[in-house]
Amino acid sequence: KLIDELEEYKKRYDEALKAHQADREVIDDLLVKLSNLEAEINLLRRRVSNLEEEVSRIKKDNLYFVNELNKARANLDQETLNRIDFQNQVQTLLEEIDFMRRVHDQEISELQAMAARDTTSENREYFKNELSSAIRDIRAEYDQICNMNRTDMESWYKLKVQEIQTQSTRQNLEQGYAKEEVKRLRVQLSDLRGKLADLEGRNSLLEKQMQELNYQLEDDQRSYEAALNDRDAQIRKMREECQALMMELQMLLDTKQTLDAEIAIYRKMLEGEENRAGLRQLVEQVVKTHGLSEIGETESIRVLKGETASRTSFQRSAKGNVSIQDASSDGKFILLENTHRSKEEPIGEWRLKRKIDGKREIVYTFPRDFILKPGKTVKIWARGQGVYSPPDQLVFDAEDSFGVGSNVQTILFNKEGEERASHIQRSSHTIS
């Protein structure tokens, strides 16, 4: 039955290990997915940052082109004002020319009048020819000046209008391209922000799942440790019960042998075959263990046939995971053990008191910050009896022996002075 239960606990332990390993693999997969998502999110964030920089650059270009367009419009307005000014100048020049023409006509009229008063035909013909020549020269010069001014004005205005139209067309094209590019980047930025929101949602969901799995893993670990502790406690209890039964059986067998030996002795005494020379020594040890989990007792009976009998009993108890497993009767060492499988026990500044026959008392104090590992033992040697090898072996430099006696009490106290474990040895001698 014990073997079946042990197999059942082992099976549960293996299943718990497999479940623990499966949870570990799931967590590793989730961590890989989380890393990939974080990398993708970082990539999208960099792309969004680049697009935002591109949008900012295009906005700057657009602002530059708008400023250039405003400058062109201002130049157009200025050129329009200049055109009006030049037209006014042309009008002024035309008026001056007209005024000069009227003045010249008046001078011509005066000259004609003077010529009319001149009765000489030759003089009249001469002045007439001179006047006609002067009029032709003035008209030719006037026509030439008007044509030159008109041609220059038309060429200049055509050139300016063409430049303004070309610049306006180019700016309109660039502004349209910039608007299309901004629209495209806005659409792309909106898509990337949507993807980023989806990925952040998935990331949050995966983090939540990973947190739940971590909680579940912690619960499984606690359940697993509790199951292990229960199994260890049951196994320890079963072993103690088996040991108690074995000790009881051994004690019965030893009692039977003792009775058989006493019967044989009495039979020989009745037959008159007593022979006290060369007595044989009969040594029997009976070990009996009591208590469910904390208290243990051991008895040793030493019989000297026909003379003396020596009886030694040991009693152990512990209030916690640290117990006194052994205290040598010759005073060489004391052995402590941490019976827990996974919990460390800080026993720094704890004290071991050993009282010999109710008189002499020996006290050993553990070093500060000393920790007894799970399932480990520590042996404290008296001076000169063992080797100093922490944390498994310590040496009590103050005494070369923990003392020897018939009634020896070894008690472990914590820093608060509370008793945590004890080991009691009692010896008695009888004469037969």
Curated annotation (Swiss-Prot):
All residue ranges annotated as the IF rod domain in the record: 1-277
Region ranges (Coil 1B): 1-111
Domain LTD: 310-427
Any one cellular-component term (Gene Ontology): nuclear envelope
Keywords from the named record: Coiled coil, Intermediate filament
Annotated stretches, region: Coil 2: 129-277
Biological processes, Gene Ontology terms: heterochromatin formation; nuclear envelope organization; nuclear migration; nuclear pore localization; protein localization to nuclear envelope
Region annotated Linker 12, chain positions: 112-128
Region (Tail): 278-432
An example molecular function term from Gene Ontology annotations: structural constituent of cytoskeleton
Coiled-coil positions: none
Source superkingdom: Eukaryota
PROSITE patterns xref list: IF_ROD_1 (PS00226), IF_ROD_2 (PS51842), LTD (PS51841)
Family to which the UniProt record says this protein belongs: Belongs to the intermediate filament family.
Name of the featured protein: Muscle cell intermediate filament protein OV71
Native source species: Onchocerca volvulus
Lineage, opening ranks: Eukaryota, Metazoa, Ecdysozoa, Nematoda, Chromadorea
Gene coding for it: OV71
